[in-house]
């Protein structure tokens, strides 16, 4: 497992990813560690994910990227962030899953430390 879907991303997206690619390395935050980080604040969650080597995937463009950048500037860093752009509807699980699976097949071997990517890519 390498990717963690945050609470803003539906479990339906996770299921759609797994239908496209049965071994896709994603888990929903509610299913990871018994859901104990579902309500964690972004800086706390990013720090925990860094310890576990998990890249967060979500829609929280406004605060997640800001907090990730702050952790990087402070020297603490993060394990990586993938955010969907505004053009991707939160209800379009098919588009989300296709974008994520296609992107991950290309990006899985990248150095993800302190990296933030947006889907679709420009």
Regions inferred by a protein language model and the residue ranges of each:
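Acidic, PIN/NYN-like endoribonuclease modules and their adjacent C-terminal/linker elements
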Residues: 1-30, 36-39, 43, 66-122
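Acidic, metal-binding active-site segment of PIN/NYN-like and related structure-specific nucleases
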Residues: 42, 48-69
């Amino acid at each position: 497992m390498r990717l963690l879907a945050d609470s803003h991303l539906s479990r339906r997206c996770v299921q759609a990813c797994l239908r496209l690619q049965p071994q896709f390395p994603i888990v929903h935050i509610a299913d990871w560690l018994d859901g104990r980080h579902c309500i964690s604040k972004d800086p706390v969650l990013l720090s925990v994910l860094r310890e576990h080597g998990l890249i967060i995937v979500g829609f929280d463009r406004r605060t997640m990227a800001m907090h990730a950048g702050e952790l990087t500037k402070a020297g603490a860093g993060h394990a990586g962030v993938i955010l969907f752009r505004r053009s991707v509807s939160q209800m379009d699980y098919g588009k989300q899953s296709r974008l994520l699976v296609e992107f991950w097949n290309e990006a899985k071997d990248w150095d993800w430390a302190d990296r933030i990517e947006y889907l679709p890519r420009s």
